[in-house]
Every structure is written in C-alpha cells, then in structure tokens.
Amino acid sequence: MQHAAHSDFEEVKNIFYQYKDIFPHIRTDYLMRQIEGGHCIYKDGIVITYNFYKRPQPIGTVIAGKFHCILHQIVKDSTKDTSASSVLKEFFEYARADVWLSVRRDNVVAKKFYEKNGMKLVGECSWAAETLPGDVYLYQRTRSLSNEL
C-alpha cells in the first residue's frame, strides 16, 4: 500500500478541505500526525487514515477486537476520476484484519459505498452528546463468536 509522505501533506489536506461539510473536525496537525505515524494511505487521489487497536475497543454498541483495524476516514479527490473501491479493497488486503468504521447515519452515499464493498452494518454509535446518530460497519476477515457489547 502506498502511504502518504511529508511531501504529500498539502495534497492530502486539500482533499479533506473539499469535504469540510462532512469532516469539519479534521485538523491539519491531526493529518500530519497520521502521515508521520504511517497511518495515512494516499493512492490515486484517495486518502485513508487508520490505526490498529492495541486492546479490545468499544465502538458504540459493538466491540472491535485487539489488533483489529479502525478506518478513521476515507476521502476521494473530487477532481480525479479514480476508483475509491479499488483502493479500499486493496486496503482491506493490506490490513489483514477486521476493519471497522463509524459513519453518520444520514450519510447515505457513504453507507451504500461501504455495503457495495463488502462491509456490513453491525452496530450503532453517536457523537455530540448522543445528538448525532451513527452506524458502525465491519469488513470481517476473522471468525468471531460475538462482537456485541
């Protein structure tokens, strides 16, 4: 997988700025830490930020396992005609673990994209003192008896 380098920072930042309505909370220092930490994929105008859990971690009504992957953000440069699906599928192979993410419940376009790429709706979550509802999706590579809280 192709990770972002320091020299990619401005391009990565500008891609996120295209989606300020969806990612108003993304700060430039966060993006720099993701790049410096090796947790930012940048390929063909697609950016994925992620991490791996060191211990079981609750995500809303479900629990991600130790060493599972959390996909924080995936964004596509709106000026490029590239396939986010192909980069996401390549990321699933790279991660070699269950991949989790949370998404705003009203983000129908993103949810259809995740489902089209093999992710399943497995739980619920919320932000902003439970005023902003969300859903939890999982791309499951491992067998598990239960991931519910």
Where are these regions (language model features)?
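Acetyl-CoA-dependent GNAT
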Residues: 6, 15-81, 85-90
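C-terminal "cap" of GNAT-fold acetyltransferases
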Residues: 68, 104-108, 116, 124-149
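Short hydrophobic clusters on alpha-helical segments that form packing/core surfaces
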Residues: 91-95, 110
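Conserved GNAT acetyl-CoA-binding A-motif
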Residues: 94-105
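Hydrophobic pocket/interface hotspot
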Residues: 12
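Conserved short alpha-helix immediately C-terminal to the canonical SAM/SAH-binding motif I
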Residues: 87, 107-110
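Conserved N-terminal entry element of GNAT/NAT acetyltransferase domains
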Residues: 1-7, 145-149
